[in-house]
UniProtKB/Swiss-Prot annotation:
It comes from Streptococcus agalactiae serotype V (strain ATCC BAA-611 / 2603 V/R). This is Transcription antitermination protein NusB. The keyword Cytoplasm does not apply. InterPro entries: NusB-like_sf, NusB_fam, NusB_RsmB_TIM44. Pfam families: NusB. GO terms for molecular function: RNA binding. Keywords: RNA-binding, Transcription, Transcription antitermination, Transcription regulation.
């Protein structure tokens, strides 16, 4: 089987999203990361698949800061909306995007935003992508 992922940062962000989504449905951290990274890779039995540090840093960071990220996201939702009302896809995307914007200084905010929007378009619909864009754009605007 040939991998469709080339381990670009975009691909690793997508794998991080998949891992975070899996964790929301009850998966274990390292198992979820290994599965998300390696499910379409061909690896010989004698070789251990090493999950890239960028992917692990994203997932671990979101997990470690989940309560803070959720509080920030909740504070920017419109009246009548709560975090519980959001889909798991949107919550996972918002947490991942906000974590990278807030904590990854080496990634420009607009790059992190654009990457999350592209993942949103792939795993959700246009309305969701616009929602994620709008909410994360507020953080970028308020931060500067």
């Amino acid at each position: 089987m040939t991998s469709v992922f080339k381990d670009s940062r975009r691909d690793l962000r997508e794998r991080a999203f998949q891992t975070l989504f899996s964790l929301e449905t009850g998966g274990e951290f390292i198992d979820a990361a290994h599965f998300a990274y390696g499910y379409d890779k061909t690896v010989s039995e004698d070789k251990v698949l090493e999950v890239p540090i960028f992917l692990l840093n994203l997932v671990n960071g979101v997990v470690d800061h989940k309560d803070e990220l959720d509080t920030l996201i909740s504070s920017h939702l419109k009246s009548g909306w709560s975090l519980e009302r959001l889909t798991l896809v949107d919550k996972s995307l918002l947490r991942l995007g906000l974590y990278e914007i807030k904590y990854f200084d080496e990634t420009p905010d607009r790059v992190a935003l654009n990457e999350i929007i592209e993942i949103a378009k792939k795993y959700s619909d246009e309305t969701s992508a616009k929602f994620v864009n709008g909410l994360l754009s507020q953080f970028i605007t308020n931060e500067n």
